[in-house]
Curated annotation (Swiss-Prot):
It catalyses: (Z)-3-ureidoacrylate + H2O + H(+) = (Z)-3-aminoacrylate + NH4(+) + CO2; (Z)-3-ureidoacrylate + H2O = (Z)-3-aminoacrylate + carbamate + H(+); (Z)-2-methylureidoacrylate + H2O + H(+) = (Z)-2-methylaminoacrylate + NH4(+) + CO2. Hydrolyzes ureidoacrylate to form aminoacrylate and carbamate. The carbamate hydrolyzes spontaneously, thereby releasing one of the nitrogen atoms of the pyrimidine ring as ammonia and one of its carbon atoms as CO2. Signal peptide: none annotated. It comes from Escherichia coli (strain K12). This is Ureidoacrylate amidohydrolase RutB.
Length: 230
């Protein structure tokens, strides 16, 4: 068992019965020219987040944790995104951006596109699981719950983008399904102003889970791991 220093209190878990979840580290969310950038969100400070996720993934894999990668998006025709009868059609900034700029149709968050791909620095390895998801929450219309329960996994460590959207949505849904969720704050990035990050982390540590950071996480898995990985 491992005890991780976190807010509001430490949490104990078995790494080999836990999963590190990497949420939507796609060009869409972390790279200039991707969907968030084109929609007017600032992605200029995502590079340190990518590096921190690399560090966390390496430490988690060495400790025997399952690594799960999410990719958010839809088919090329956007059938999976829902039509006018879906609130997603009206609230998705990617869909709204494409309606405003028709030349982008088929380029944002479409499976097979550059936008949909994971950033070059983050490459899933054999034994990892890569899951597509059609909505903010990784539990909605995906086999995530079944994958976790069949492996006896109850503790989830979250990284990725966006803290205040897909990361928080997935962690919240996990809370309702009796999963213990921890977010590594320096391995996440918000969509929007900095207060959105602070608000999401406040919600998580106060109501739905725990908040820690990459160095503390790596040190908890192995006291010498962070120095070695860094």
């Amino acid at each position: 068992m491992t005890t991780l220093t976190a807010r509001p209190e430490a949490i104990t878990f078995d790494p080999q019965q836990s999963a590190l979840i990497v949420v939507d580290m796609q060009n869409a969310y972390a790279t200039p020219g991707g969907y968030l950038d084109l929609a007017g969100f600032d992605v200029s400070t995502t590079r340190p987040v990518i590096a921190n996720i690399q560090t966390a993934v390496t430490a988690a894999r060495a400790a025997g944790m399952l690594i799960i990668w999410f990719q958010n998006g839809w088919d090329e025709q956007y059938v999976e995104a829902g039509g006018p009868g879906s609130p997603n059609f009206h609230k998705s900034n990617a869909l709204k951006t494409m309606r405003k700029q028709p030349q982008l149709q088929g380029k944002l968050l479409a499976k097979g596109s550059w936008d949909y791909q994971l950033v070059d620095e983050l490459v899933p390895q054999p034994g990892d699981i890569v899951l597509p998801k059609p909505r903010y929450s990784g539990f909605f219309n995906t086999p995530l719950d079944s994958i976790l329960r069949s492996r006896g996994i109850r503790h989830l460590v979250f990284t990725g983008i966006a803290t205040n959207v897909c990361v928080e949505s997935t962690l919240r849904d996990g809370f309702f399904l009796e999963y213990f969720g921890v977010v590594l704050e320096d391995a996440t990035h918000q969509a929007g102003p900095k207060f959105a990050q602070k608000a999401a982390l406040f919600n998580i540590e106060t109501f739905f889970g725990w908040v820690s950071d990459v160095e503390t996480f790596c040190d908890a898995l192995s006291p010498t791991s962070f120095a070695h990985i860094a």
